[in-house]
Structure formats: structure tokens, C-alpha cells
Amino acid sequence: RRQTGSPPAGGARQPLPYEELAKLASSVVMLQVYDDQNQCYKTGSGVLINGSGYILTNFHVAAGGRYYGVLLEEETEVFYTDELIKYNQDLDLAILRMEKRRAPIPIYRGPEPLVRGQKVVAIGSPLGLFNTVSDGIISGFRTVGRRSMLQFTAPTSHGSSGGALLDLYGNLIGVITAGFDDGQNLNLAVDYQSILEFARGLL
């Protein structure tokens, strides 16, 4: 059984070893986005957020897709879905649903605030390289439009969008959404508060 999330009140908080955090990649998927001609024209990442097959990703990953291929760790089969349950372009978030079930990653709910310098782990599929795991720190807090963003240093590349940014306790603190080609390790994620607002009623 996975040990993730915040401990019970009064319990000592013990960070998970990196090896255990890396195992959470089993709840992070690679997405293939198909057009009307049944061609896969882009890829991204997504995070399972409940036990009913709901996948959280970026709107800009899901946008324009006729249907989606979902790749899971330890599965040779590709699972297909055309169920776009919900999206919000301002928050750059979307939720897909697939029939396959997997354990979700819990979303951070506090009570301690995130802090600059806090260690984080990123899991995504940059450049189509399935479920790459990297680590770094929170380097800042930004606001972009309606989005509260976490700036972090864990290396990511194109295809990581929609991937998971985790704290060291296995909680989802952000959805990776942007990187800057001209800025080394300058990456942004939509933060957990925006995720909780967007996914209310679906968790």
C-alpha cells in the first residue's frame, strides 16, 4: 500500500525517499492527442486525481483533440478516450476520463504553506520520453492571468505539460504547464489551490 499524503494530526512528517516518490509515476500518464484524421499530432502528460479514471492535464494539451491515447506504466496497451469532462482555458486545466482505473495522487491541502526553496519532484514525459523523474526546488510564486503559478527548477521539456509537481510527501502541489527554452530550469506549474478550485466535486 502506498504511503502518500499528509500524516494524521500529531504524527511526525517524514519525507518519502526519492525511490518511493518515483513510484508515483504509475499514476502519471502520457497523453497522445489525435486529430480528425486519426493522426497523433502532439503529446503531453496527465495525472490521475481520483479512482474513477479522471486525468488532470493542461487545457493546451487537450485542446483540439478529437480523442486521446493514454499510456500507463506497466501496461503495453494504449487506452483510448474521447471524454473531455471539464476544462478552463483561463486556468489552463482540463480533465479527461478513461475506463482504466489506477490509484490517484492526492492533491495537497495544507495546512502548511508552500515556501520558496522547498524541494519538489517533477514527473512527466518530456519530448515523448515516458515518465521522466527529476527534482529541484520551488524558486518563486507567480500570478499569470487568473493562474497562481509555482516557479520551480526541476528540469522539464516539451511534453512535460500536464505532468505532476510533487512535494516530498507524495502530494500533488502543481500541474506542470510551461517551460522557457531560453531560461535554464525556469519552469511553471499551476498551483494546488487552482487545481482544487477547478476540480471541485470531482475528487
Regions found by a protein language model. Name each.
Residues N50, N58-A63, S134, H158, ...:
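Short beta->alpha transition motifs characteristic of CBS
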